[in-house]
């Protein structure tokens, strides 16, 4: 049987990435052009700046991905692209590049949900056993997803307000930490103590929804009041207390979901899955199912994960026409025509 090659393009936010996947899960290349330095001074992603950077580098990323993979365009079998969710301008740049490439080389186009990419990044670790449950945690999303079979996704719980990664960045900004703040807060938390009493919203309620806005507000109020009174707060303890509250919420809801949906595998993915505190708590507290977390290099936004998700859609022959539109608010409902 001939080898199958898929070129994948990801541009949903502030990373321009192109990857080449051989067969089901062998990543031959995964080029990532990060824009973090460009957005740091703004304390967050500026959509117009992100789109401009994507335009500047996406063609070069495609060339580099093919070169590193050691193949030429004529060997490709399909082109995959993130079509949502994400920033509409950023999505459109990657989609335009992918559609043009697919048209020029007569290749089918595979539309991929960005969050399916995060989830399916776990395929590089091991073959996944279905049905499974996934905790997806990133800058824009916090959701529990039940996957009955490859490509069939159902949200069973999600945040009512802030995503967990968004909360990290907002409290990081209050403390004067560099954007994105997640890694630094995690590192500082390991040096501090959980001494500040922050709320754990809805932690004892029976549903599977999350809320982080109250925790974020409590943190901001504590920090503001201390500044007004001239009090000095220990940054390491602030981070430890904030992270303890976040992880208590995530673990409590995940455990409830596992009780409700008896599965053998829990996938934890998304940018926040790189958090060492989260990984430690998962290892300590969830021992009756197989916990699968993508390697650090596949936790943040990257085209490798899009390619891994695309392989499943390709198997099902889920292709799109070249008039495919970006869906910035795309929700998990499996494949959308």
Swiss-Prot record:
Keywords: Acyltransferase, Cytoplasm, Iron, Metal-binding, Transferase, tRNA processing. The gene is tsaD. GO terms for biological process: tRNA threonylcarbamoyladenosine modification. Transmembrane segments: none annotated. GO terms for molecular function: iron ion binding; N(6)-L-threonylcarbamoyladenine synthase activity. It catalyses: L-threonylcarbamoyladenylate + adenosine(37) in tRNA = N(6)-L-threonylcarbamoyladenosine(37) in tRNA + AMP + H(+). Belongs to the KAE1 / TsaD family. Its EC number is 2.3.1.234. It comes from the Bacteria. It is an enzyme of class 2 (transferase). Pfam families: TsaD. The keyword Magnesium does not apply. Substrate binds at residues 136-140, 169, 182, 186, 275. Required for the formation of a threonylcarbamoyl group on adenosine at position 37 (t(6)A37) in tRNAs that read codons beginning with adenine. Is involved in the transfer of the threonylcarbamoyl moiety of threonylcarbamoyl-AMP (TC-AMP) to the N6 group of A37, together with TsaE and TsaB. TsaD likely plays a direct catalytic role in this reaction. Binds 1 Fe(2+) ion per subunit. InterPro entries: ATPase_NBD, Gcp-like_dom, KAE1/TsaD, Peptidase_M22_CS, TsaD. It comes from Streptococcus thermophilus (strain ATCC BAA-250 / LMG 18311). This is tRNA N6-adenosine threonylcarbamoyltransferase.
């Amino acid at each position: 049987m001939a080898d199958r090659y898929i070129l994948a393009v990801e541009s949903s936010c502030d990373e321009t990435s192109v990857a080449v996947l051989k067969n089901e899960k062998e990543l031959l290349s995964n080029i990532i052009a990060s824009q973090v330095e460009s957005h740091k001074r703004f304390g967050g992603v500026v959509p117009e700046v992100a789109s401009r950077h994507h335009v500047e580098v996406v063609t070069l990323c495609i060339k580099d991905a093919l070169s590193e993979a050691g193949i030429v365009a004529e060997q490709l079998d399909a082109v995959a692209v993130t079509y949502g969710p994400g920033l509409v301008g950023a999505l459109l740049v990657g989609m335009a590049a992918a559609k043009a490439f697919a048209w020029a080389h007569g290749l089918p186009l595979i539309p991929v949900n960005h969050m399916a990419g995060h989830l399916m990044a776990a395929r590089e670790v091991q073959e996944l056993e279905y049905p499974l449950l996934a905790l997806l945690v990133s800058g824009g999303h916090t959701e529990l997803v039940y996957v009955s079979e490859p490509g069939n996704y159902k949200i069973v719980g999600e945040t009512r307000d802030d995503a967990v990664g968004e909360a990290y960045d907002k409290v990081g900004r209050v403390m004067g930490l560099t954007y994105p703040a997640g890694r630094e807060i995690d590192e500082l938390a390991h040096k501090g103590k959980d001494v500040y009493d922050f709320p754990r919203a809805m932690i004892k309620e029976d549903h599977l929804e999350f809320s982080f806005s109250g925790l974020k507000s409590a943190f901001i109020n504590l920090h503001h009041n201390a500044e007004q009174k001239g009090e000095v707060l220990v940054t390491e303890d602030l981070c430890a207390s904030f992270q303890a509250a976040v992880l208590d919420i995530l673990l409590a809801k995940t455990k409830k979901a596992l009780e409700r949906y008896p599965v053998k595998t829990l996938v934890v993915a998304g940018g926040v899955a790189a958090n060492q505190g989260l990984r430690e708590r998962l290892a300590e507290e969830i021992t009756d199912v197989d916990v699968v977390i993508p390697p650090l290099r596949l936790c943040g936004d990257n085209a490798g994960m899009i390619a891994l998700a695309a392989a499943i859609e390709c198997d099902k022959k889920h292709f799109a026409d070249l008039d495919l539109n970006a869906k910035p608010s795309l929700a998990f409902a499996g494949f959308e025509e």
